[in-house]
């Protein structure tokens, strides 16, 4: 994938002193593949550098890690593109991840971030990630850190010593943006750098008309679960909420049935016109206990 060229494009160039970035990257790849900790690698490998070399490499603010991640992902996708068969879908997935970080002085860490894994609020980093998935592979394309109002440190505390045009400053300054803004910016960067996909999958947090409209303008059909609440959508016609639309259609539509594990369900779809989004497809899936609603801007 011409990794040396990608490193140069991402400003990974050798300085006056130190080791070439390409060699250090290879060491990190080896640690990842062999599942070795850095301390173990340094202790047991004759070719390892001193630990300070790896720490300086990671902390270097001039390296554009985001560009390196996107360009390398796009290059890998081009290599595996011939493996795709007709009918297989390529997906971009926007997801939120909570990474526990207990320290008070960690950049971007926040208090009272809800963790679905631990089922409680914890001190953590709130990470918005853009991932790629198909029938053969899945990997991360981009990510951003979102800082909420319960931040542990002020932004000025870790940007004051950085040049305002540096990659590090720009990256650390974006954490006050909204999740929707971060997600759209990541999607736009990925598409501009040659990442190709058929659909964008998001959770109910991003299932808002303005976000879906912006994704459609970038050429990405959106599939998402909608929150089944009393929220009023600007649908054209008499019925405005999900339950109202479901009740009006459930007796006049042919229902299909299925089973997932021990859960039996019935579902049907309908084409509805929205004031902002135009014609969209809604899929209503009922498990007997819960009603799940999904939206797709691809009505084919």
Q: Where are the predicted features?
A:
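Gly/serine-rich nucleotide phosphate-binding loop at the start of the catalytic core
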Residues: 1-67
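Short, conserved catalytic/metal-binding motifs centered on acidic residues
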Residues: 27, 41-44, 88-102, 130, ...
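Conserved aromatic-histidine-acidic binding/catalytic patches
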Residues: 29-33, 42, 118, 171-178, ...
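Hydrophobic, Leu/Ile/Phe/Ala-enriched alpha-helical segments that form helix-helix packing faces
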Residues: 31-32, 45, 76-80, 187-194
């Amino acid at each position: 994938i011409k990794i040396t060229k990608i490193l140069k494009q991402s400003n990974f160039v050798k300085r006056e002193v130190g080791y070439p970035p390409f060699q250090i990257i290879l060491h990190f790849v080896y640690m990842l593949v062999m599942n070795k900790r850095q301390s173990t690698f340094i202790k047991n490998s004759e070719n390892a550098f001193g630990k300070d070399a790896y720490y300086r490499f990671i902390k270097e603010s001039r390296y554009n890690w985001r560009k390196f991640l996107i360009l390398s992902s796009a290059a890998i996708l081009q290599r595996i593109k011939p493996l795709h068969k007709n009918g297989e879908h390529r997906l971009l997935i926007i997801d939120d991840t909570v990474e526990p970080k207990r320290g008070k002085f960690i950049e971007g860490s926040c208090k009272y971030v809800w963790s679905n894994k631990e089922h409680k609020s914890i001190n953590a980093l709130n990470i918005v990630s853009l991932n790629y998935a198909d029938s053969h592979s899945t990997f991360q394309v981009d990510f951003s850190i979102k800082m909420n109002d319960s931040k542990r440190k002020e932004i000025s505390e870790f940007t004051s010593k950085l040049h305002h045009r540096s990659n590090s400053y720009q990256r650390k300054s974006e954490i006050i943006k909204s999740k929707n803004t971060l997600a759209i910016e990541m999607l736009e960067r990925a598409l501009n750098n040659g990442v190709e996909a058929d659909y964008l999958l998001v959770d109910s947090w991003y299932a808002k008309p303005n976000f879906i409209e912006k994704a459609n303008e970038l050429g990405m059909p959106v599939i998402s679960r909608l929150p089944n609440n009393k929220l009023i959508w600007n649908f054209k016609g008499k019925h405005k909420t999900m339950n109202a639309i479901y009740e009006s259609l459930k007796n006049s539509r042919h229902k299909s049935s299925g089973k997932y594990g021990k859960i039996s369900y019935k579902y049907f779809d309908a084409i509805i016109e929205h004031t902002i989004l135009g014609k969209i497809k809604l899929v209503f899936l009922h498990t007997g206990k819960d009603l799940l609603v999904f939206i797709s801007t691809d009505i084919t």
